[in-house]
Amino acid sequence: MNKNYKDTLLMPSTDFEMKANLATKESKIQQKWLDDQIYQLRLEKNQNNEQKILHDGPPYANGDIHVGHTMNKILKDVIVRRWLMQGYYSPFILGWDTHGLPIEHAVQSKLGQKEFFKLSVLERIEVCRDFAFNQVQKQKEQFSSLGLVTDFKVCYHTYDKQYEIDQLKVFAKMINEGLVYQDYKPIYWSWSSKSVLSDAEIEYKETKSPSIYVTFKTLDNEVIGKDVNLVIWTTTPWTLPSNLAISVHPELEYTLFEVNGQKYLVGSNLYEQLIAKFNFENPKVIQKLKGSSLDKIKYQHCLYDQITGIVVLGEHVSDSDGTGLVHTAPGFGLEDFIVCKKYGIDAYVPINDEGCFDQTVHDPELVGVFYDDANKLIAQKLEARNCLLSLNFINHQAAHDWRTKKPVIYRATKQWFINIKSIKNQLVENINTVKYPNERYAKRMLSMVAERSDWCISRQRTWGLPIPIIFDENHEPILDKELIDNTLRIMEAEGIKAWYEHDAKYFLTNKYDPRKTYYKESDILDVWFDSGTSFNVLKENGIKDKATIYFEGSDQYRGWFNSSMICATVLNKTAPYKELISHGFTLDEKGMKMSKSQGNVISPLTIIKNKGADILRLWAASIDYSNDHRIGNHIIEQNSEIYRKIRNSLFRYILGNLNDFDFKPLDQYQLSLADLLTINHVNKSFKKIDQAYLNYDYLEITKEVNQMVVELSAWYFELIKDSLYCNDENDPTRKAIQATLNYIFINSLFRIAPILVHTAEEAYSHYQATNKEKSVYLIDPPALFEIKTDLDLDQLATEFSKLKDDVYAEIEKLRKDKVLAKSNEAVVYLSKQYLDINKHLVKQLKTWLNVAEVHFTKNDQITVEKTDFSKCLRCWNYFKELSKNNNEVCQRCSELV
């Protein structure tokens, strides 16, 4: 007869394409979300439900988004989508950090520095605002290509008027609580930025520095006598012209010794080590004494005869390295500054904003010399004066400006500070209320607060929020609540520009004499203060509770996590977030930091253009984000392969086999044992995925999804093809299989949708169920099917899996030897170990193994041979006898053709 039986089969049919074409489709899907207002509809649907809020930490509004940005935003989007799909009210409000030096520098580069500074302050602010606005618009467009579940019209920017006013109200509260003060003390100074820097704006890089040992001779005293060489060690020779004291620890022991007619003093614990270092021969110990006995001994400066200093007592001194005596320049070190303050010694700072020695230095040869260049000249002078014992060079980690990448110095300047010490206990208490992934994160947050000094909040820049403080005629700040409140009222009514448009008297209240002279502060607030008050945005958008979670890079423990905690503790007496998680940094495929100079920068926009955002999203969900992680062409290709499995082996396979399904509830079908085993198996996967979502463990989710697809494809999806394609359309077994597939589809789709957002929407659009929602993102969570059976499905699955693996191993040998083309040609003789196999499996084995025959034997080994049965030309299975009515097909197929 040789009929074409293919036309009689119920083959899969769906318009859901095998080839994704994501780069083409994604923008259309995004536009449909906008047109249908899917995000707004979901929020409306959930509006009376419990709130869960992820507060978006604002990225800096400068330049194209990079792969680190995209990883961060994708994972945040996954969190929020999952919450929304579970029914929580979870608006996702994106933010941008828009003030600060990088924008100022970018505008200066664009206009030219001379032209920039020809502008008035208000004009400079306006051009910076315009630049920031354009950068935000560009980044919004780029972020939108990721398919984020947000409204880009409802965002926050730190230059927004209401944002700025809310920020100033936090500052005013700090003033009213006595936390704000002005002081002159050393802090990080960036000569390349001409501004102070916060701890969060510092990065450490390996640097080569001089390591020198220098002597200062004592003046006449009754403790150790005249002309004793006090030995100090320093890696900053350029600070020696500013030396005003030498610190010793009051409790440490010091050794006075003599070599070649010269007397020296060093810490006793370092004596032997230093003798060897300086190649001193036959030293003679004269005396050992406590540091406290050296207090206020005077000495001659190592460089200048007209300058003297004194020995001071400091608890910061150590005898683990150096000499046990510490060169002390209060203008260039915080500990130096603190110890000298106790002795009434003021800071001396002969270095200007550009990092060069100014006219106040005691040495005319140093005037105008850059501090780092002065090291060589100073070393030469020390050697000429016989004050240089040793000079070497060492590599060590030194502080650098994170934006300009140039070294920074500690330098005393007059700045505004927040007194952290007085609120540390409250900070620790609030930090301990936060939930962390593990104790390591909690300790990290606590250590940042424990180690934190007072927060310097003033910056010498233009583009930012002004510090609204007025000074009296003596240049003393007026920290008066009534005056501060009045200033804020004016700025709220007229805008921040009022601070620059009016003189100081405009802001005075009636109690101040307008005939006197007043001054305005010209500094602006630290940008970390800007972003640190962003929690106010939630209240402005009708969110009553604090954020559920903050999720940013691990560098934010000393940055945004920290500044937010401080600001919220002052304003609300509570932490700004309930949970805190962080991620590492994105490296290239070799584990190297990306940089333009290395040529290893991977653009997320290129990946989106070539592969699609869903591939990038899958990558972000498949990394261990808690640590540094990698990306590269090979890694993206691996994720593309996993994506293809999910798209085709799961979504497309199922959709193709649901084209004639009736979509009734699962319990209305006669589910087979294979169906039940499969439902039981996928339920385990779904529960693991649900738990992983609770733990923010997306790597576990992608692993579980991939494993589930592999396992379904390896057995159940192969097993059911015969019934799906060859049985009657309305056959109960076939309908039960379709019901099982439908169950797997909607539950898988629901769980994969927060990650593969465009693909999930596309798949849902081809899903033919009745009473569908407009979007997959509007569906309710599907309930897990509760299997009611007395059978131990787990045990059955384990038993069958073991048997299947053993049988397939033997079949594979014959396939390699070309004896078998397919497994359904095999006759299987089971070994004696399977004689006691579960009775429920016995009658299923031929079908479940997809073989021609199964025989039980008492043999020691499983054996396989090729069947001599006849092949049905319709279903391609092998039978001892074909249909009597049609000897080309089996009995079942004969009845259907």
Swiss-Prot record:
- The chain's coiled-coil residues are none
Top EC group: ligase
State where ATP binds: 596
On cofactor binding, the record's note says: Binds 1 zinc ion per subunit.
Indicate which residues the UniProt annotation says bind L-isoleucyl-5'-AMP.
552
Q: Name one GO biological process term.
A: isoleucyl-tRNA aminoacylation
Work out whether the entry's keyword set contains Metal-binding: yes
Question: Is Protein biosynthesis there in the keyword field?
Answer: yes
Q: Name the needed cofactors.
A: Zn(2+)
Where do the annotations place Zn(2+) binding?
A: 872, 875, 890, 893
Which InterPro entries does the annotation name?
Answer: aa-tRNA-synth_I_CS, aa-tRNA-synth_Ia, Anticodon_Ile_BEm, Ile-tRNA-ligase, Ile-tRNA-ligase_type1, Ile-tRNA_ligase, M/V/L/I-tRNA-synth_anticd-bd, Rossmann-like_a/b/a_fold
Its EC number is 6.1.1.5
Molecular function as annotated in GO: aminoacyl-tRNA deacylase activity; ATP binding; isoleucine-tRNA ligase activity; tRNA binding; zinc ion binding
Task: Give the residue interval(s) assigned to the motif 'KMSKS' region.
Answer: 593-597
Tell me where the sequence motif 'HIGH' region sits in this chain: 59-69
Predominant cellular place of this UniProt entry's protein: cytoplasm
UniProt catalytic activity: tRNA(Ile) + L-isoleucine + ATP = L-isoleucyl-tRNA(Ile) + AMP + diphosphate
Q: Which keywords has UniProt assigned to this entry?
A: Aminoacyl-tRNA synthetase, ATP-binding, Cytoplasm, Ligase, Metal-binding, Nucleotide-binding, Protein biosynthesis, Zinc
What compartments host this protein? Cytoplasm
Q: Which GO terms describe its cellular component?
A: cytosol
How this chain assembles, per its entry, is: Monomer.
The UniProt entry's sequence similarity note says: Belongs to the class-I aminoacyl-tRNA synthetase family. IleS type 1 subfamily.
Q: What is known of its domains?
A: IleRS has two distinct active sites: one for aminoacylation and one for editing. The misactivated valine is translocated from the active site to the editing site, which sterically excludes the correctly activated isoleucine. The single editing site contains two valyl binding pockets, one specific for each substrate (Val-AMP or Val-tRNA(Ile)).
- What is the role of the protein in this entry? Catalyzes the attachment of isoleucine to tRNA(Ile). As IleRS can inadvertently accommodate and process structurally similar amino acids such as valine, to avoid such errors it has two additional distinct tRNA(Ile)-dependent editing activities. One activity is designated as 'pretransfer' editing and involves the hydrolysis of activated Val-AMP. The other activity is designated 'posttransfer' editing and involves deacylation of mischarged Val-tRNA(Ile).
Specify the protein name: Isoleucine--tRNA ligase
